[in-house]
Amino acid sequence: MTVRDGIKIDVPWCNSLFHKEYKSEVASITTPRQLTVQKIENVFANEWCLRHHYLKRKLYIARNVSYGIFKNGLCFGVIVFGYPVWTQYKGVVPPHHPGEVPELLRLSTVSGLPKNTESFFCAKAFRMLIIDWKSETGFIPKVITSLCDLSQGFNGSLYRALNFTEHSRGKIGRPSNPGGKHGKWGGNADKTVAEKIMFTLKLGR
């Protein structure tokens, strides 16, 4: 097994959720405080999302900042923030510059973790993002945005627990189409844009 910067990077993705070491570690975690959060390579985060996030596809955005949540070098989840692809969005850009508004694009954790692990993970990542986003983009992040996909059974409870505010709702963004194309390229079979909620969180409050 290869370890780089304390991360076991070659645990087989195809069976990592059922890997003996993973199962043993998950069973040993009784509180989120046993876990650590650290910045990770976007390639690692993308591979995780391809295998374990419900959308089953990689992100192709040039400027991302990604974090993983770990115990004993094993990754139990990732969160990915990206530079927004839109140049304006009423009430968000303006007044802010797009570079000040990172979008929370992916959040994925394994099952069986203690209650409130995702909230713990997000809160840690938000604090780290203030420094790491500026290093990546040159901008100080002011607001985090994220889309909650109602068509996939999500209701926004995690966002509300993290003090996000509902900004708007409707057929926002691209089709969900888990496992398939989601843009206008490549013959996307799902042309219907899903009902979503855009949530925003002001940083530095």
Residue ranges and their predicted role:
Residues 6-14, 35:
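A positional "C-terminalness" feature that preferentially activates on distal terminal regions of long
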Residues 17-61:
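Short amphipathic alpha-helix that is part of the acyltransferase structural core
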Residues 28-30, 78, 115:
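Compositionally biased, charged N-terminal/linker segments
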Residues 31, 43, 75, 96-98, ...:
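A short, polar/charged loop/turn motif at coil->beta-strand junctions and beta-hairpin connectors
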Residues 49, 63-83:
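Conserved beta-hairpin
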Residues 200-205:
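Short beta-strand-to-coil "C-cap" segments at the C-terminal boundary of structured domains/repeats
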